[in-house]
């Protein structure tokens, strides 16, 4: 097998992980900003705001783990001889 294919798989896997990490970081930051803004405006609504926040963060992190699975597929399923 051509070594450029293996190198391409590794570079592609790295790009997938980098994009997923950047997206997850931005998503978590936006959700955290909305939570802090909401609690600062209405402190009594803190209990009602935490549930949607944790659901949003969980979905964002789930998308990152899906990226991790695709990275593993690209890197480890590439046949290298």
From Swiss-Prot:
<feature type="transmembrane region" description="Helical">
    <location>
        <begin position="57"/>
        <end position="77"/>
    </location>
</feature>
<dbReference type="GO" id="GO:0005886">
    <property type="term" value="C:plasma membrane"/>
</dbReference>
<keyword id="KW-0812">Transmembrane</keyword>
<keyword id="KW-1133">Transmembrane helix</keyword>
<keyword id="KW-0813">Transport</keyword>
<keyword id="KW-0406">Ion transport</keyword>
<dbReference type="GO" id="GO:1902600">
    <property type="term" value="P:proton transmembrane transport"/>
</dbReference>
<keyword id="KW-0446">Lipid-binding</keyword>
<dbReference type="InterPro" id="IPR035921">
    <property type="entry name" value="F/V-ATP_Csub_sf"/>
</dbReference>
<dbReference type="Pfam" id="PF00137">
    <property type="entry name" value="ATP-synt_C"/>
</dbReference>
<keyword id="KW-0138">CF(0)</keyword>
<comment type="similarity">
    <text>Belongs to the ATPase C chain family.</text>
</comment>
<keyword id="KW-0472">Membrane</keyword>
<dbReference type="GO" id="GO:0015986">
    <property type="term" value="P:proton motive force-driven ATP synthesis"/>
</dbReference>
<feature type="transmembrane region" description="Helical">
    <location>
        <begin position="5"/>
        <end position="25"/>
    </location>
</feature>
<dbReference type="GO" id="GO:0046933">
    <property type="term" value="F:proton-transporting ATP synthase activity, rotational mechanism"/>
</dbReference>
<comment type="function">
    <text>F(1)F(0) ATP synthase produces ATP from ADP in the presence of a proton or sodium gradient. F-type ATPases consist of two structural domains, F(1) containing the extramembraneous catalytic core and F(0) containing the membrane proton channel, linked together by a central stalk and a peripheral stalk. During catalysis, ATP synthesis in the catalytic domain of F(1) is coupled via a rotary mechanism of the central stalk subunits to proton translocation.</text>
</comment>
<dbReference type="InterPro" id="IPR038662">
    <property type="entry name" value="ATP_synth_F0_csu_sf"/>
</dbReference>
<dbReference type="GO" id="GO:0045259">
    <property type="term" value="C:proton-transporting ATP synthase complex"/>
</dbReference>
<keyword id="KW-0066">ATP synthesis</keyword>
<dbReference type="InterPro" id="IPR020537">
    <property type="entry name" value="ATP_synth_F0_csu_DDCD_BS"/>
</dbReference>
<comment type="function">
    <text>Key component of the F(0) channel; it plays a direct role in translocation across the membrane. A homomeric c-ring of between 10-14 subunits forms the central stalk rotor element with the F(1) delta and epsilon subunits.</text>
</comment>
<dbReference type="GO" id="GO:0033177">
    <property type="term" value="C:proton-transporting two-sector ATPase complex, proton-transporting domain"/>
</dbReference>
<protein>
    <recommendedName>
        <fullName>ATP synthase subunit c</fullName>
    </recommendedName>
</protein>
<dbReference type="GO" id="GO:0008289">
    <property type="term" value="F:lipid binding"/>
</dbReference>
<comment type="subunit">
    <text>F-type ATPases have 2 components, F(1) - the catalytic core - and F(0) - the membrane proton channel. F(1) has five subunits: alpha(3), beta(3), gamma(1), delta(1), epsilon(1). F(0) has three main subunits: a(1), b(2) and c(10-14). The alpha and beta chains form an alternating ring which encloses part of the gamma chain. F(1) is attached to F(0) by a central stalk formed by the gamma and epsilon chains, while a peripheral stalk is formed by the delta and b chains.</text>
</comment>
<keyword id="KW-1003">Cell membrane</keyword>
<dbReference type="InterPro" id="IPR000454">
    <property type="entry name" value="ATP_synth_F0_csu"/>
</dbReference>
<feature type="site" description="Reversibly protonated during proton transport">
    <location>
        <position position="61"/>
    </location>
</feature>
<keyword id="KW-0375">Hydrogen ion transport</keyword>
<dbReference type="InterPro" id="IPR005953">
    <property type="entry name" value="ATP_synth_csu_bac/chlpt"/>
</dbReference>
<dbReference type="InterPro" id="IPR002379">
    <property type="entry name" value="ATPase_proteolipid_c-like_dom"/>
</dbReference>
């Amino acid at each position: 097998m051509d070594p450029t294919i293996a190198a391409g798989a590794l570079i592609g896997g790295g790009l997938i992980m980098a994009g997923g990490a950047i997206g997850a970081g931005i998503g978590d930051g936006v959700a955290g900003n909305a939570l802090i803004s909401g609690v600062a405006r209405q402190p009594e609504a803190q209990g009602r705001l935490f549930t949607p926040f944790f659901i949003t963060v969980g979905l964002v992190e789930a998308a990152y783990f899906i990226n991790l699975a695709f990275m593993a597929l690209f890197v480890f399923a590439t046949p290298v001889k």
